[in-house]
From Swiss-Prot:
This is Uncharacterized 15.5 kDa protein in transposon Tn4556. It comes from the Bacteria. Residues 35-59 are annotated as: Disordered. Residues 36-52 have a biased composition (Basic and acidic residues). It comes from Streptomyces fradiae.
Length: 143
């Protein structure tokens, strides 16, 4: 059975995943957009149709990138983590498409990953549509 996309409910990400402000902001940025509008030749698993077969965490040119990004960033429950929590306060942010990780208190590492966030979002919603200041505010909120 195909699971529905993640949705925000009362400040939390659905299905028991830990809420991350950057994931919530991402949903705001891409909400209401038809991410698959230019992929009409592809079946969409979110609506009960067959999906292209791929390995878990693998992005392909045919995937709706923003949807996958939200899913990957939101999937930081401890059972999914490859990186352990060091002091119980750092929030791990894992990008499954390149297996990189950043800790909320690791400012240089997080800034580097935010560059990837902007790239992924712009690929999904169009060049020049993602404000770097928004991502910078999110970095402060996470830290």
């Amino acid at each position: 059975m195909v699971k529905p996309p993640l949705r925000c409910q009362g400040g939390q990400v659905a299905r028991g995943h830990r809420a991350l402000s950057i994931a919530l902001k991402t949903e705001d940025l891409v909400g209401g957009l038809s991410i698959t509008k230019d992929r009409g030749d592809r079946d969409d698993g979110r609506y009960g149709e067959p999906r292209i077969q791929r390995k878990p965490g693998q992005l392909t040119a045919n995937d709706p990138v923003a949807y996958d990004f939200v899913r990957h960033v939101a999937s930081v429950s401890t059972r999914d983590l490859k990186v352990g929590v060091v002091d119980g306060q750092r929030i791990p942010v894992r990008f499954a498409h390149d297996k990189s990780a950043a800790w909320a208190k690791d400012t240089p590492g997080l800034c580097k990953c935010l560059g990837r966030v902007r790239h992924v979002l712009e690929h999904a919603v169009g060049p020049g549509t993602v404000d770097a200041a928004v991502l910078e505010r999110e970095r402060v909120d996470i830290a």
